[in-house]
Each structure stands twice: as structure tokens, then as C-alpha cells.
């Protein structure tokens, strides 16, 4: 923080999903890589989070927390394990429904397992959404990342294959993505189809 001329940072040491964290509607942008797995004691969880999705799983609670902490119109890009994207529990579906119905889920970028090796080998994705409180999801852009410029083994050596520049280019030109087929690396899925598949 000192390198960015922040001489008096506000740093709080607390459990972010607990009742002690009362931050609400304060941030314009949240970029996050929260803990992937784990559960917390139900009695300590903030009720405002369990109202969105009744669970003790941190991977879901953190996304609910980001929604609470954003200002209306605030944007978030967060890394989540695949379970958040494809989990079939009521809590998983409730969180996805919240994003699709009450906010604007803009993009889901699937990343290959190995991008966080040697620390974690789980498959992950990036959720990009805007807090609206009034919906706004019409189509969701999906991108299937195959490579990030590094080998997907424990060594993570630099390699030539890297989808990140392509992701950025396509994301900034989404109007060119509308006619892509589902067999391509990126494509849109209409909200109606997401709803039909139970989110």
C-alpha cells in the first residue's frame, strides 16, 4: 500500500462473513479471490448473507458478501470454484438466481484446473457482475479458457499458449460475440435458457 502512496490504510482483521462485518453498499468495484473451500459456524454468519443463500459454505457466502458490499451500479469480478457455477444444492441455485434475476450477471469465464497450482488444483471460474437490485441480465457471455500463458502442472513454466489477451479483446467487443456457436470458445447464453436449466 505504501508503494501506491496510501500512508494510512484502513485494515480490519475480522471474519468477513461474520456478523461483525457490517459493511454495506460502500464499494464501486470489487476484485476478489476468496477462499475456495471451507465452512463457517452457522451461528456466526451475518443474516444478510444467509438471506441470499442459506449455507455455511464460504465459496457462496463470499459472493453474497460482495453483493452486499457493492454500491448500486458497483461491479465485481471474483474467482470462484466450479461448484459455484454448477453446484446443484438449493444454496448454489439460490445464489445464481440472485445474480441472474436481481442483478446483472455479465460473464462467466471458465478457467482450467491447474491455474492455481501448486497451491490448488481445482477448476475455477471468474464471475463478472453488476449490482443493480433490479435485474438486467439478458444474456450471459461464457468463455472457456484453455491456457493462461503457463503450464498447468506444479511447475507453472511460461508457455506460448495464452487466452488472456483474447478474453480481454472479446470482452471489450461483446457486440461481435452474438453470432458465435456453442462449439466455439466463447458464446452468449440467453437468460431464458439459464432459468429453464434451473440457474
Residue ranges and their predicted role:
Residues 18-199:
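A conserved structural/catalytic subdomain of Rossmann-like adenosyl-cofactor enzymes
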Residues 1-24:
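S-adenosyl-L-methionine
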Amino acid at each position: 500500500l505504501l508503494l501506491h502512496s496510501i500512508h494510512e490504510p484502513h485494515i480490519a482483521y475480522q471474519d468477513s462473513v461474520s456478523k461483525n462485518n457490517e459493511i454495506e453498499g460502500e464499494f464501486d468495484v470489487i476484485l476478489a479471490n476468496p477462499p475456495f473451500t471451507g465452512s463457517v459456524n452457522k451461528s456466526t454468519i451475518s443474516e444478510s448473507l444467509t438471506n441470499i443463500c442459506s449455507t455455511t459454505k464460504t465459496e457462496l457466502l463470499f459472493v453474497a458478501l460482495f453483493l452486499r458490499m457493492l454500491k448500486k451500479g458497483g461491479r465485481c469480478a471474483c474467482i470462484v470454484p466450479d461448484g459455484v457455477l454448477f453446484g446443484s444444492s438449493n444454496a448454489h441455485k439460490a445464489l445464481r438466481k440472485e445474480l441472474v434475476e436481481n442483478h446483472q450477471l455479465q460473464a462467466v469465464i471458465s478457467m482450467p484446473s491447474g491455474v492455481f497450482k501448486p497451491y490448488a488444483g481445482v477448476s475455477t471460474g471468474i464471475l463478472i457482475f453488476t449490482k443493480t437490485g433490479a435485474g438486467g441480465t439478458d444474456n450471459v457471455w461464457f468463455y472457456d479458457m484453455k491456457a493462461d500463458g503457463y503450464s498447468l502442472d506444479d511447475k507453472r513454466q511460461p508457455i506460448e499458449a495464452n487466452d488472456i489477451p483474447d478474453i480481454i479483446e472479446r470482452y471489450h467487443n461483446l457486440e461481435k460475440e452474438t453470432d458465435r456457436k456453442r462449439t466455439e470458445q466463447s458464446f452468449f447464453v440467453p437468460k431464458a435458457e439459464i432459468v429453464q436449466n434451473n440457474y
